[in-house]
A protein has these predicted regions:
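Active-site mouth of glycoside hydrolases
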Residues: 1-110
Length: 110
């Protein structure tokens, strides 16, 4: 985040997927070795931590979801599929709202 702030960025976009947002398992990302502050967090907790970290540098955050699952691209054009129901999509957005929308620098969702 420091790099982004130093280069003049004032907003970043965090893409997510519904399946991972609904998971209660800790994230398993190879990049967490460098970002030790993300180790052991769930997917929603990871986004909250990243938004909080961005806030320290005055960076705004936009959350976007264009995938039902991590590998679902381009998909069939719907916001749900055989693995992720419409109810799951609503639950996922509910998690985003509950966990992240109170964070001052989360300014938009898509």
């Amino acid at each position: 985040m420091q790099f982004l702030a130093e280069k003049g960025f004032n907003a970043i976009r965090f893409p997510f997927n519904h399946k991972s947002m609904l998971s209660t398992d800790p994230i398993e990302l190879p990049g967490t070795l460098k970002a030790k502050f993300l180790r052991g967090l769930t997917y929603p907790q990871m986004f909250l931590r990243l938004a909080q970290h961005a806030a320290k540098y005055g960076i705004l955050v936009m959350l976007t979801c264009h995938r039902t699952t991590p590998g679902a691209w381009p998909g069939d054009g719907l916001w749900h599929d055989k693995d992720i129901s419409e109810e799951d999509v609503l639950d996922s957005w509910g998690i985003v709202a509950d966990e992240l929308c109170a964070q001052w620098n989360v300014f938009a969702v898509d």
